[in-house]
Design a protein with these regions (language model features):
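C-terminal outer-membrane/trafficking sorting elements
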Residues: 25, 843-852, 856-927
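Residue-level detector of functionally pivotal "anchor" positions at catalytic/ligand-binding pockets or at interdomain
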Residues: 660-663, 668, 833-852, 865-867
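C-terminal beta-rich recognition modules with glycine/proline-rich loops and embedded aromatic residues
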Residues: 278, 337-345, 350, 356-456, ...
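Short, aromatic/His-centered strand-loop micro-motif at the edge of beta-sheets
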Residues: 761-782
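Short, solvent-exposed beta-strand-to-loop segments that form ligand-recognition rims
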Residues: 796-814
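Short tryptophan-centered beta-strand motifs in secreted/extracellular beta-sheet-rich domains
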Residues: 667, 714-716, 779-788, 792-794
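Aromatic (Trp/Tyr) and acidic
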Residues: 28-117, 148-164, 198-216, 220, ...
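Secretory/extracellular carbohydrate-interaction modules
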Residues: 694-757
Length: 927
């Protein structure tokens, strides 16, 4: 028989490919599924669900969840559009969209972590319906809901179910679905939420690829990445606000959820920009929107650093999952610190201590929880009140994955057949190491409520493998002991590796001494940290039940029974012996305020003038340092997560340091510096400050709370869109969320109404007067406000004749800021001067003439004073001596605004000449 040599060789090659397919994964861990080539090798590998089991206080949280919101979810939320028998994810006619998938995503790991047969049976019902009702083309889920996004949480649930059970239906099911998606997504592309959250889909595509090697999956990952928002660009360059009316990239559930996408995709792209996007994005977010509990705020859009801004519970669990995922891929120990800060503070701080209530929003300074929308952009009557039904429906379904995901990712396999502690808490891990040897490590600790962690190894035989322990960045003097022998070169912010032959009952002790740290918060206030825990003022809580849903589930308002308006009477530069740490016996649940095993005591003073806003929030901490004549008291601080009402951002007692003579802002940095936002989403771009978000935020304002002006001259440039109005506020205080939640004056322009507006607010809006004027949308206007005593003048473009002159003295002093109502608004070249400073210029030459800003970009303000002369001239000359501008002036002090955007860059001279031989000059630079 004649043999076709080419076919023989091809068959031989194919045989060897099939035989050695497992070897196409990267050389590394032999016990768990690694990344296949061409995906990059990762330092850590996730362990299957069930490898890690919680113990101690951490197990208690899972049990509380079982006996609380998760275990009773199908009773509480039994509508067909939720989890009832008519739910479309069970074949019914309801419309549950993301809700049932969210719930099942958390239910599956909780059920198998607890090995609870009742929960397992509930989970099986949902999993079976999806697996058994896949159509022939691979589509699954409700036929009336074709949203790609709604399937992503269910895919996570099915993946975890496979890890726990090995059900052989899962791999073909996922393969068929992803083939369908690959064939369909070009004609039915990602949109809206799916476009924001495509990273979840890509993660699951890679998970399947590592098990099957199907090459179409890599192409699908590319399609998903290319259809998603450009998250690498957004995180790298702080461009969350750059998408006009599309709110998706600034939505603060999408943001923490999408933060993992560039890193996930970097496994294929190998692009350094994708790898770096997480760290750069995190730095942007915490600088501009960071809160003490380790989250960026957003209610629901990114919203600055005010301590009254909300953090949505959905964003908390998504931030946790992102940190868990990204640390596996990057191996950056700092990410574990960030994970623990969110997990131990933001998560329990958004739940009642029996986990029978959630809070849709939680605030850093939430001193009471009352009904009312509260001025949030996405406001809900019960958005701050503990309830099984708090706020919008997403959080009550998404929160279930928080604690279970944390537990299942506490440990990971290493790429060299070892184990790594990724985050900490009482638990037990059973996993394979070395050459298929099973070991168990018991992690005995009350961490983060104590400093010591004890790891006991159980093994049936001596076995050599690396054990990696994450050393937190906040720990200055970590200690590791192996069977009593202290290890060397244990460095903060790294994984420390103990590589040795381990014997049964070997013990590793990790000591993490916890020092008090202060973090700067809004208005120069501080938050107090010890280890991964954030501490808040202990406030006696009064819970008032307003609804009863049965089985112990109620809806509450929570009120303070003790004072909360304290500032810390300490020197922040010397914290030694300032705080007294008290530790007590470890309770079953450390997040119960009365039982918490650790408290801090510190000296403080009350600040009587610090109170509630018009809408009953705690006003932001007064700009510090703050004076107080009150007696020193000793106050108690408890962990953030041990309270549902709290004060976390404390002013420091001291001598105030306000800006009250000259303030200028050219917005030259690419980030928000010193501005405190109250509603709306603001950005800085190319020398402009921009309010970008109008949907849900009819009144957006941002202030420089470091300023304190009475009589003032306020110059600024502003342009508004074709609806609403935009301008500035002054003499403002008692600021809060909401269009009119402040005391103070407002001056604005409107292209929609063709007028200039002067009004005031005191919790309600009051129009004082307006002036009819042709205002073009998206065109710059130069505006000046002069407020001297009760007289307020408003100039627009023409600085010689005011458009408005009005008398009102409702407010005498306060900060300055910007505000808009239902308008996309741009500001630039803000300059504020104390009017008395201008009018009191003396006859010393440098006091006769002041130029701000200098150097200038688009405009300057010239303060001048003719002391002896009756009249004179103001002349501007360029560097060659040519006269650029001449203006007649009269005796006295005045301010002249000069547009310089048409000037060539260079040095210019301003010369004041009086008719009595009075002359003064100064140079300025135009950039």
């Amino acid at each position: 028989m004649k043999i076709n040599v080419n076919m023989y060789i091809y068959g031989l090659i194919l045989f060897h490919i099939c035989l050695f397919a497992p070897l196409m994964a990267h050389a590394g861990n032999d016990n768990y599924v690694n990344n296949r080539m061409p995906l990059t090798k990762t330092p850590f590998i996730p362990l299957p669900l069930g490898s890690v089991n919680a113990e101690g206080w951490l197990l208690k949280q899972l049990k509380l969840q079982r006996d609380g919101l998760t275990g009773y979810a199908e009773v509480l939320y039994n509508d067909a559009n939720d989890l009832g028998p008519g739910c479309d994810w069970l074949g019914g006619a309801g419309d549950s969209w993301e809700r049932a998938p969210y719930y099942v995503k958390g239910l599956v790991p909780l059920a198998y972590l607890l090995n609870d047969q009742n929960l397992i049976a509930k989970a099986q019902k949902w999993i079976d319906w999806s697996l058994n009702n896949q159509t022939r083309n691979g589509f699954f889920g409700p036929s009336g809901n074709t949203d790609w996004w709604a399937r992503m949480p269910m895919l996570y649930a099915i993946r975890d179910y496979y890890d726990a059970t090995g059900d052989d239906r899962v791999i073909p099911f996922l393969t068929n679905y992803f083939r369908y998606q690959h064939a369909t997504i070009d004609s039915k592309p990602l949109s809206s939420w799916g476009k924001s959250r495509a990273g979840d889909n890509i993660e699951l595509v890679f998970w399947l690829y590592n098990r099957t090697g199907d090459s179409f999956l890599l192409d699908l990952a590319d399609k998903l990445k290319n259809q998603a928002f450009p998250w690498t660009y957004i995180f790298t360059h702080n461009k969350f606000m750059d998408f006009g009316a599309d709110f998706q990239p600034k939505h603060n559930v999408n943001v923490p959820q999408a933060m993992k996408m560039p890193v996930i995709y970097s496994q294929k792209s190998k692009n350094q920009a994708d790898i770096d996007a997480y760290r750069k994005g995190r730095e942007h977010l915490m600088r501009d929107h960071g809160q003490p509990q380790g989250m960026q705020c957003g209610d629901e859009m990114l919203g600055g650093r005010s301590a009254m801004r909300g953090i949505e519970l959905c964003s908390v669990v998504e931030q946790m999952q992102t940190s868990e995922t990204v640390q596996i891929i990057l191996g950056d120990a700092r990410i574990g610190d960030e994970l623990e800060q969110v997990t131990f503070n933001a998560l329990p701080g958004s739940l009642s201590k029996d986990i029978k209530c959630l809070q849709y929003y939680a605030q850093a300074n939430q001193v009471q929880s009352k009904y009312g929308g509260g001025g949030f952009g996405q406001g809900y009557h019960n958005g701050l009140t503990p309830s099984a039904f708090s706020g919008y429906g997403c959080c009550r379904f998404n929160m279930h994955s928080g604690w279970p995901y944390y537990v299942k990712t506490l440990w990971a396999a290493t790429d060299d057949n070892g184990l790594a502690a990724m985050a900490y808490g009482p638990c037990k891990v059973t996993a394979k190491v070395a050459d298929d040897v099973e070991v168990t490590i018991v992690e005995d600790t009350h961490y983060p409520f104590e400093e010591e962690l004890r790891f006991t190894i159980t093994t049936s035989q001596p076995v050599n493998f690396p054990l990696k322990l994450r050393i937190p960045s906040w720990c200055k003097n970590p200690v590791i002991k192996v069977n009593g022998a202290e290890q060397i070169e244990v460095n903060p912010g790294e994984f420390y590796t103990v590589n040795r032959t381990w014997n049964n009952n070997d013990v590793v002790v990790l000591e993490l001494p916890m020092e008090i740290r202060l973090n700067e918060e809004v208005n120069n206030s501080v938050s107090v940290h010890r280890g991964p825990l954030v501490f808040s003022l202990k406030i006696q809580e009064r819970w008032v039940a307003n609804a009863d849903y049965g089985n112990g589930f109620k809806e509450y308002e929570v009120f303070p029974e003790t004072d909360w308006n304290y500032g810390l009477a300490i020197d922040p530069a010397d914290l030694k012996n300032v705080f007294t740490v008290t530790q007590s016996a470890m309770p079953e649940n450390p997040f119960v305020q009365s039982d918490t095993p650790i408290t801090l005591k510190v000296k403080a003073k009350k600040i009587p003038e610090w109170g509630y806003s018009h809408n009953n929030f705690a006003c932001d901490p007064p700009f510090g340092p703050v004076e107080s004549s009150q007696n020193i008291e000793e106050i108690t601080l408890v962990p953030f997560g041990a309270e549902n009402i709290r004060l976390t951002c404390f002013p420091l007692i001291g001598t105030p340091k306000y800006t009250g003579t000259i303030f200028q802002e050219n917005f030259e940095n690419d980030h928000i510096d010193g501005w405190v936002e109250y509603n709306g989403s603001f950005m800085v771009n190319d020398g402009e400050y921009i309010a970008t978000n109008t949907e849900g935020y009819l009144g957006s304002k941002s202030v420089q709370s470091s300023t304190l002006f009475s009589d003032l001259i306020y110059d600024f440039k502003v342009k508004v869109g074709d609806r609403g109005d935009g301008g500035v506020i002054f003499r403002a205080d008692r600021l809060s969320l909401g269009a009119d939640e402040y005391n103070g004056y407002y001056v604005g322009i409107s292209a929609a109404d063709q007028n200039v507006i002067l009004g005031k607010a005191d919790g309600n809006w009051r129009l004082l007067t307006s002036f009819r004027m042709a205002i073009q949308a998206d065109e710059w206007y130069q505006v000046r406000v002069e407020a001297i005593g009760a007289r307020i003048k408003v100039y627009v473009n023409d600085m010689d004749a005011p458009k408005i002159t009005y008398t009102d003295y409702s407010f005498s002093t306060g900060c300055i800021g910007v505000r808009c109502y239902n308008a996309i608004t741009h500001w630039s070249n803000l300059h504020v001067a104390d009017a008395s400073y201008v009018s009191n210029l003396k006859d010393v030459s440098m006091q006769k003439l002041g130029i701000y800003p200098n150097p200038a970009k688009d405009s300057i303000n010239i303060h001048y004073n003719l002391v002896y002369s009756d009249e004179g001239e103001l002349n501007i000359l360029n560097s060659t001596g040519s006269l650029i501008l001449k203006k007649k002036i009269t005796k006295g002090a005045a301010l002249f605004h000069l547009e310089t955007h048409t000037f060539s860059p260079g040095v210019y001279a301003c010369i004041i000449k009086g008719n009595k031989d009075e002359i003064v000059s100064s140079k300025f630079i135009v950039q």
